Structures are given as C-alpha cells and as structure tokens.
Amino acid sequence: MSQFNVLNRYLFTDAHARGELVQLSSSFESIIKNHNYPVGVEKLLGELLCATCLLTATLKFEGDITVQLQGDGPVGYMSVSGNNKQQMRGIAKMAEETSADTLQTLIGKGTMIITIRPNAGEAYQGVVALDEESLADCLAHYFDVSEQIPTKIWLFCDTEQQLAAGALVQLLPDGDGSTENKEQQQSDFEHLCQLTNTIKSEEVFSLEAEALLYRLYHQEQVNIFEPQMVSYLCGCSADKCLSAISQIEPSEIKAILAEHGKISMTCDYCITTYDFDELSLKSFISKVNH
C-alpha cells in the first residue's frame, strides 16, 4: 500500500517485449470523491484511469492523452486525461441512474476515442468501436488496429477499498515497424501473457510492485526502470474561473450579481465551487459604465 500511486515500466530482455504495472489508491479516490457514482460506474472509471496511465507511459514526448468512452447506454460519456508526468483527472456523466456493472451495459453501443496531444506538434486521434466484452480487450484491439503491435492489458478495480490497478505486456517492434523472428517473438509474447494471466486481484492490491513482478516473472530476465509517481491534478483554479467570467458581457455580470449576489462556478471534475461577489468582480463590472 505504501508504494501505491506508482507506475512501473520494465523490459523483458530475452523476449523483445515490454511491460507496465500501475497501482493506484488516493489518485483513484480523488477522482471518484464527492461524485456519488454507482459502484459499477466507479469500477469502470477506475479501469479507465489505469488504462490511461498505461497509455501515457508509452508517450515518447511531452504531451497528454485523453481516453473517452461514448455510447447510448446509461453512462453516455466517460473520460480520463493524463500527461507524461502521470497527472490524471477523470469524469463520468450519467444520463440516468443505473446498477449496471459491465462495459456493455454501462456505455452501451459506442466508441472509444483516444486523443494524443504532443506539446509540440499536431494532435491525432484513434477511434475504435466498443465491440469487445471488456475495456482491456477494447484497448488491445486499439493497439492491434492502430499500431499493429501485439498488446495485452489487464485491469482491476476494488471500489470498496478504492483501489485500482492495471498491467500491460507489449511486443516491441524493430526499427522499421515490423518484428524480427516473428514466430519466436509471438511465442515469447504468449508465454509472458500466460504468466501475467496468473495475477490475482488480491495480489495486485496488496503486494508492492517489486514483489508482484518477482512472483510473476522470477524465471524471466526483467529490467525494471525507475518508478513514476501517479497523481490527481484537476487543473481548476479561481484564476481560470475569472478568465471565463471575463468573456461575459459586463452588463450581464452586473445583472447576475443583482439577482444572486454572486457568481458561482463549480468544477465538473473535483466539485470545488468558486464564488465571486461584487467586490471580486469590480474590475469587470466597471466596464459597463465605459
């Protein structure tokens, strides 16, 4: 537990493959706090959070990734964003109350949209249908379609303990995008997937990364990189709210203040409410007289 909110990356040096393991506690708790989501929604949001962590760890540049689920089910929209510093935020929007607890019954018929935005360069998107039974399988399909890289993902969430975790195994391409010794590499990949399939939820929520990786891969040559901390970062602030208010006509600001005595703005992500009274908005109101 003490080492949760951490993402570990590692190489299988004899198998031309890579892996990732993310274990989250307070960063997941912060995303669901104050929202009163149903259990099934919390579980899927925890899985999506871990999936986005795993995806951002694949970035080779400074930037961010947003993974959105959109569909015609009771949860019409769910989104998690994260950057190369593993700073995450997420939200779910429900069209109706639901006791559903699977991807298909929560989102319904829909799509997964993955948007990658480098700080320098053009953003690009990948879109796949949510045709698989689980979010993990949909992500593996995304890699198969968009990257042509064999990838397997495992996702776990315990809403009672407010813990979430995920693992990834991915075959490494060679320099020109193909794989050398394909049959051997595919065999190695399947072997690593079989080992990772033995992971149990009680292990991923109780063992620290080093112990868990040893349990899974003690017969493999594994090179573990420096772990990276994962944190919750909503990004809202009073200054950003004031910037939004500045786009409102001064006369309208004055009218709202006259009726309500303040302007209130609530962040969709963290549910923090910012209140601005006449004094704090004096500079905006003064424009109405000019």
Swiss-Prot record:
This is 33 kDa chaperonin. Keywords: Chaperone, Cytoplasm, Disulfide bond, Redox-active center, Zinc. It comes from the Bacteria. It holds the Pfam family HSP33. SUPFAM superfamilies: Hsp33 domain (SSF64397), HSP33 redox switch-like (SSF118352). GO terms for biological process: protein refolding. HAMAP family: HslO. GO terms for cellular component: cytoplasm. Gene3D superfamilies: helix hairpin bin, Hsp33 domain, HSP33 redox switch-like. It is found in: Cytoplasm. InterPro entries: Heat_shock_Hsp33, Heat_shock_Hsp33_C, Heat_shock_Hsp33_N, Hsp33_helix_hairpin_bin_dom_sf.
